[in-house]
Amino acid sequence: MKILISDKMSDKVEDVLKSKQIDYDIKTGMSPEELKGVIDQYDGILIRSATKLTSDILADCKNLKVIGRAGVGVDNVDLDQATKNRILVMNTPLGNLEATAELSVGLMFSIMRNIH
C-alpha cells in the first residue's frame, strides 16, 4: 500500500505509517494539475483543508481506494465522483474535540474577566 500525504500533518501521522510499514510520500503545495498527474500512483491519500479533490482530479483514478480527511468536514472532496470510482472517503470528526473544548473554556474565562 502506498499513501500520498498532500497537506501538512502532525508528525504522529508519519510515526503511525512507519510503525505499520506503510510506504508514503509527502508532497504538499501541489497545484490541481500536479495532483491530478500523480494521484493515481497511490492507494490512498491523506488530506486536510488545503487539498481540493474535485471531480476532475478524481475522474480518472483507478487505483485510489481511500481518501482520509484529517478534520470534520469533507466539503473539499467530490463525494459523487468518489462514489462513482468506489473510493472510500473517511474523516476524523473528533480529532480536534479536545482543542475546541480548551478554546471554549479559555474564551469563557476571557469574557468573565473582561480580557480583550
Region locations from a protein language model:
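N-terminal glycine-/charge-rich "phosphate-binding" loop or analogous flexible N-terminal tail
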Residues: 1-42
